[in-house]
Every structure is written in structure tokens, then in C-alpha cells.
Amino acid sequence: MILEKNIDMVSERAILLMALGSLQALEHQAITIDESQRILFSPYISTHLENNKVSKRVIDIITECCELEDIFEIIPTKYIQQTLRILQNRIIKILKRYDEEPRKRWVIIDEE
């Protein structure tokens, strides 16, 4: 996925949906922390979002997810799923603040 330089509300919602999916995949051990960092949860992405004036609440949740590896090293294993669920619930609350997107499709395939 290529992050556009001009991130609009649709892109913010797409980022949140990608974060939500990544957290669920982590919870179900379908991806690793390293993979989630390559996908979305990295300081590089956080900085890119900041530079493109993405809302603070989106940047904050992505930045917090960037710290998951450190968090997992200090909390007992039994609290990892609970931590992931808390983050997922926060993302869901943020998503509910957006109006429904009227566009027919979010993803457009360029068939050159």
C-alpha cells in the first residue's frame, strides 16, 4: 500500500482499519511484532503521518502501537491480549467519530 502525501479522512479511516486488523492479527498470532512494525507500527510511519497533518488521535494510537514490542517485554504474557484488546477498542471508538464515507470504492486498481 502506498500512503498518499495528502492524507484525507478516507485515508485516516483506512489507516485506522489497517491498525485494527494488525492488532487483531497480533492477538491471534497471525503476524509477529516485527511484521506489524514493517506494515504500519513504525516511527517512520508516525513521522510521515505527522508531516501530512493527520489528526492527533490517529497519530497517537499509531505511535502507541509502535511501542508494543517494548510493552510486551515488560508486561506478563497473560496481559498481552488484554493490551491488544484495549488498543483495538480505542481504535473502534475513533472510527465511530467519522462519518460514513460516500465513495463507492476506497481502493482503485490501476490497470495499465
What are these regions, as identified by a protein language model?
Residues 1-112:
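Acidic, Ser/Pro/Thr-rich low-complexity regulatory regions
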